[in-house]
Swiss-Prot record:
InterPro entries xref list: BDS_K_chnl_tox, Myo_ane_neurotoxin_sf
Other observations noted: Negative results: does not show any inhibitory activity against chymotrypsin, trypsin or papain.
Disulphide bonds in the chain: C5-C41, C7-C33, C23-C42
Localisation: Secreted
Chain positions with Serine amide modification: S46
Record flagged with keyword Transit peptide: no
UniProt keyword terms in alphabetical order: Amidation, Disulfide bond, Neurotoxin, Protease inhibitor, Secreted, Toxin
Gene Ontology cellular-component terms listed: extracellular region; nematocyst
Family recorded in the similarity comment: Belongs to the sea anemone type 3 (BDS) potassium channel toxin family.
This protein's record includes keyword Secreted: yes
Protein name: U-actitoxin-Cgg3
The organism of origin for this protein: Condylactis gigantea (Giant Caribbean anemone)
Length: 48
């Protein structure tokens, strides 16, 4: 399962990905924020 993360500007939790390039395609993400170090939080969470 993907780790959860939270962005101050979003309600609820997103999916945490451990890379710099942004959110991966194919998961329906439409918002993101970056979390240090080297992670990105993607909304809306997939598979929940």
């Amino acid at each position: 399962a993907l780790l959860s993360c939270k962005c101050e500007a979003n309600s609820g939790y997103g999916d945490k990905w451990l890379f710099h390039g942004g959110c991966p395609n194919g998961y329906g993400y439409n918002e993101r924020c970056f979390i240090k170090p080297g992670a990105v939080c993607c909304y809306p969470p997939s598979g929940r």
